[in-house]
Every structure is written in C-alpha cells, then in structure tokens.
Amino acid sequence: MLSRRIIPCLDVRDGRVVKGVKFRDHIDMGDIVELAMRYRDQGADELVFYDIGASPEGRSVDYAWVERVARLIDIPFCVAGGIRDVETARAVLHAGADKISINSPALGRPQLISELADAFGVQCVVVGIDSIREEDGQWRVRRYTGDPSKTQALPMRTLDWVAEAQRLGAGEIVLNCMDNDGVRHGYDIAQLRQVRALCRVPLIASGGAGEMQHFADVFDQADADGALAASVFHSGAIPIPELKRFLRAQQIEVRDGQ
C-alpha cells in the first residue's frame, strides 16, 4: 500500500491565496509563497495551486509566482488554471511545476487530455472535476466554478466524465465535491466510493475536511489516495504534523513529516 498523501490546496486570485465556501464568497488567506513555505515546513506531501480566475477570464496562470514557489520549496506541486494547450502546459512545467491540472478547458475540448499525456506523460496530467448533486439525485459536472457569475451546469454525469478522462489519458483525478466545499462536515464518502469503483488511477478527495477523523474516514471508507484540504490548513485548525500522527495512530500509512 502506498502512503496516503496530505495535500494543502491554495486557491489563487490576483496574486493572493483565497478561500470560499461552496466556491463562493472568497476571503483573503495570505501570500502564496509564505503559505507554500509554511506547508513545506509542516510536512505536506505536495501542494496544489488553483488560479481560480484564469479559465473564466480566458487567460493563463501567472508564471511569475509559479517560478517563485519552485525556487523556494522542495516538495512536488501541481498548478491549475487556464491551461488550454500544450504550449501553456509546457510553460507552467518549465516555470517549475511538477504536474499540471486541467478542468474546464478539458470539458470544452476533451482531446486536450490526450495531447498533454502524449507530450508530457500521464504522470504529469491531473484532471480536476467539480461535481455537484442535482435535484434528480445524480452527480453532474460544472465548469468555470472560479467565478460564480460564469459557472455552467453541464448535463454530463460525474461518473461518465471520470471514465472518459481516464480513457483519454488522465494520470490522476481530483474530485472536488462542491456540496461539501468549505463547510467542514466531512468528505462526500458516498460519491467518492462510486468514483473509486471505476477509477484506476490515483484519486484525490477534495471538499469537506473539518476535523482529523474526516481524513481517516476518506482513506478508510473511500480508499482515496490523497486528501486535499484548504480552510482547515490555512486557519491552523489542523496542523499537518498532528494530522499525520493521528493517522498513524489509526494504522493509516502516511509519509514522514515533522
């Protein structure tokens, strides 16, 4: 069994880290580089940066802060936001990112997944999926969630998109459970279990962490490979070293940290 990964998520807007609830009402959480260095020192396994305005605004990520982060941390990090083609992805990786993540652009042009996998290898290609439960009880995909005024509800079922993304070459899936985002009531175990049943690549759970037991639950009950969280880390409610000690005490294998 591979070690489970603890992954702080940093949503970036206008050069700052922000955090919202259910992808809305974002507040400032601090400087990108300062937070990245804090999590490096605390023993995070990797970091994910989402430039949440890039896709809705039709632009690419700001390479300057990617380069600054790469110079100062020695843990893997993934960058998402406005990556629509191989050239942009190459620039992000050249700036120092270890992986790139695509979400809305892949929904508009699914072949982008294959193009990136062919160019850089599947290990570099993460597909993020923003999923919400609709009135009919089905989980469906949304895009442009970084800007509530531009968010689009799509008819595609989440499970169908997970299967298609893998077929096209996704090397990892990050499932952002929008109903649970920022509310700290726990991960969406029911949805994650369904996705896990058909997901052959690493699955990262996102949305809902509020206490240490929630991390244990998502590893034990949904068999997630990693758990991504934001507000509980940014606020200091859950220090990563304490979280790892807690998980080890429950016989969950995690990488050594502080």
UniProtKB/Swiss-Prot annotation:
EC number: 4.3.2.10
Taxonomy, superkingdom: Bacteria
Catalytic activity, as annotated: 5-[(5-phospho-1-deoxy-D-ribulos-1-ylimino)methylamino]-1-(5-phospho-beta-D-ribosyl)imidazole-4-carboxamide + L-glutamine = D-erythro-1-(imidazol-4-yl)glycerol 3-phosphate + 5-amino-1-(5-phospho-beta-D-ribosyl)imidazole-4-carboxamide + L-glutamate + H(+)
Entry annotation: catalytic residues: D11, D130
Function: IGPS catalyzes the conversion of PRFAR and glutamine to IGP, AICAR and glutamate. The HisF subunit catalyzes the cyclization activity that produces IGP and AICAR from PRFAR using the ammonia provided by the HisH subunit.
Principal localisation: cytoplasm
Species for this entry: Xanthomonas campestris pv. campestris (strain ATCC 33913 / DSM 3586 / NCPPB 528 / LMG 568 / P 25)
InterPro entries membership: Aldolase_TIM, His_biosynth, HisF, IGPS_HisA/HisF, RibuloseP-bd_barrel
Protein family (similarity comment): Belongs to the HisA/HisF family.
Pathway: Amino-acid biosynthesis; L-histidine biosynthesis; L-histidine from 5-phospho-alpha-D-ribose 1-diphosphate: step 5/9
Subunit structure: Heterodimer of HisH and HisF.
GO molecular function, one term: imidazoleglycerol-phosphate synthase activity
Regions that span the bilayer: none
Keyword entries, A-Z: Amino-acid biosynthesis, Cytoplasm, Histidine biosynthesis, Lyase
GO annotations of cellular component type: cytoplasm
Protein name (database record): Imidazole glycerol phosphate synthase subunit HisF
Localization per Swiss-Prot or TrEMBL: Cytoplasm
GO biological process: L-histidine biosynthetic process
